[in-house]
Regions:
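Metal-dependent nuclease catalytic cores that hydrolyze phosphodiester bonds in DNA/RNA
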Residues: 1-169
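Mg2+/Mn2+-dependent nuclease catalytic core
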Residues: 156-265
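Acidic, carboxylate-rich catalytic segments that either coordinate divalent cations
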Residues: 268
Length: 268
């Protein structure tokens, strides 16, 4: 039995959870467990300690978090420099307080972009789930149009969560179990600031995520693509479809990261 053919589990009715996925935990059969009720009776984010206790498994994106992301690091450095250029030291402010304020200001830029991206992503997700949503309709229609131009009319399944025997889980934005060539399609939606599609490129992180999703969903030969939705120009999108050779390489890389994550965290 190959790694890609090992048993997997689906959440029969994927919960419509819009909570933060910052902790990215799932039950073995694919039910999201982003939060947990603590001993004090209050809801809080699920931790690694909780995961060990309840036998939860990490999401694909949590596993990918152990890998260095040079593009993200460069972007964060730029945000800090921009915040420093637009902020002056206040009278009586200590060096450390000034540095802390610059760092917080730089993080706010990222939070603002992330918040807008989440809103757009939610609007697109709602469309494919058949849920009425009034915001960001130009972004939604641009995404729908781009997917139809690329793949034709496909019976998309939105936000399906899964758990896999190898010890990883996740929730896929869009997938179809069959298409014109019969192997299925897996699509991950990304929002990004861009006005020229030529500026948009895919990274190994995207490749690994999609390759793990298709295995987790039980369609290991599916086509895989990222659709990048512009935050700055409503309706503008770019689709990057990965080759089968890249996807095979991506899954090998992901399995290496998964093994590292499990050993590092002493949790399988």
């Amino acid at each position: 039995m190959t790694e890609q053919s090992k048993s997997l589990f689906y959440a029969s009715e994927p919960p419509k959870i819009r909570a933060s996925e910052s902790n990215h935990w799932y039950t073995r059969d694919g039910i999201p467990q982003y939060t947990i009720v603590g001993k004090n009776g209050k809801e809080r984010n699920t931790t690694l300690r909780d995961a060990r206790e309840h036998n939860y498994i990490p999401s694909v994106t949590t596993v990918l978090g152990v890998a260095n992301k040079p593009a993200l690091v460069a972007w964060m450095q730029t945000q800090v420099l921009m915040a420093a250029l637009t902020s002056t030291k206040r009278e009586g402010e200590s060096e450390q307080d000034y540095i802390d304020r610059i760092i917080q200001d730089s993080k706010q830029q990222g939070r603002d972009a992330a918040d807008l991206g989440t809103e757009i992503h939610t609007a697109i997700e709602s469309f494919f789930e058949g849920i009425s949503h009034d915001k960001h309709q130009e972004h939604v229609q641009g995404c729908v149009r781009s997917l139809e131009e690329q793949y034709g009319r496909v019976g998309w399944i939105a936000e399906r969560s899964f758990g896999h025997e190898l010890g990883f889980a996740g929730k896929c934005d869009l997938h179809a179990t069959n298409d014109a060539i019969g192997n299925g399609i897996v699509v991950d939606i990304k929002t990004k600031d861009f006005t020229d599609p030529k500026d948009v490129v895919g990274y190994d992180e995207h490749l690994m995520q999609l390759s793990a999703y298709r295995v987790g969903l039980g369609i290991p030969n599916a086509r895989c693509a990222n659709i990048f939705v512009s935050r700055t120009q409503a309706g503008l999108c770019k689709i990057i479809e990965w080759s089968e050779e890249d996807l095979q390489r991506g899954f090998e890389m992901f399995c290496s990261l998964l093994k590292f994550w499990q050993l590092k965290n002493k949790h399988k």
